[in-house]
């Protein structure tokens, strides 16, 4: 059963149809990528799934519930987590204060907040950084904190916006391992990133979008060997 589905999504700006009847799906314990050249409509599609941009037509279903008109906050309450491309941590706060800032928005007891805090710190291997100020963290530590914050609401689904952007190769590898671990725990994951190799190396499937439509979908091998994908996006010399 699919956890997230979009059905015939349409988004127009003036006379320009940026997304043109686009349908994608992501199941539980599955990592799916959205790829495509600049202006293809992939980011718009992703933001419609998140709830930042409203669709002009079509449907978005989460766990079989129609969420097309629901806000990003309502989607979060249903079990969707979102990791933005922009830095989302409070640099002047400690690691545990950053996590507690979100925990305090939940309707749970102080004891449960403390338990959840300790559990999250341990799960993402940042317990030793609990009292460190966020501005002192390395790139890898900061990305772990950002992912931890996205997990505070205990989501069943994560939307990751450019998770490999602006970080060193060693940090990319760490982020990939975290994402694969989340998949192993049963989360469905939709990610979009301009780093094609890094994305295809961990996705079960990917959609390549061009001119607001799906050009091809399938495994990394399917995309790499597709003539149209090479012509429009990957190039003839692309190799994993």
What are these language model-derived features?
Residues 35-37:
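The feature captures the beta-strand-to-loop junction immediately N-terminal to the Walker
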């Amino acid at each position: 059963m699919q956890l997230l589905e979009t059905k015939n999504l349409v988004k127009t700006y003036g006379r320009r149809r940026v997304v043109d009847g686009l349908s994608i799906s992501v199941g539980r314990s599955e990592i799916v990528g959205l790829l495509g050249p600049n202006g293809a409509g992939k980011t718009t599609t992703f933001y419609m799934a998140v709830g930042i941009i409203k669709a002009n037509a079509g449907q978005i279903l989460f766990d079989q519930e129609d969420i097309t008109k629901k806000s990003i906050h309502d989607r979060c309450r249903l079990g969707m987590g979102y990791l933005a491309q922009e830095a989302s941590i409070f640099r002047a706060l400690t690691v545990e204060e950053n996590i507690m800032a979100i925990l305090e928005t939940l309707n749970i007891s102080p004891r449960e907040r403390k338990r959840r805090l300790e559990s999250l710190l341990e799960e993402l291997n940042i317990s030793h950084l609990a009292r460190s100020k966020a501005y002192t963290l390395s790139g890898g530590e900061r990305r772990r904190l950002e992912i931890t914050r996205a997990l505070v609401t205990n989501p069943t689904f994560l939307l990751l916006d450019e998770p490999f952007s602006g970080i060193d190769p060693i940090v990319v590898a760490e982020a990939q391992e975290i994402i694969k671990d989340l998949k192993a725990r049963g989360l469905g994951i939709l990610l979009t990133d301009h780093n094609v190799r890094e994305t295809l190396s961990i996705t079960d499937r990917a959609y390549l979008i061009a001119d607001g439509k799906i050009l091809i979908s399938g495994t990394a091998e399917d995309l790499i060997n597709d003539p149209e994908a090479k012509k429009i996006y990957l190039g003839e010399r692309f190799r994993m």
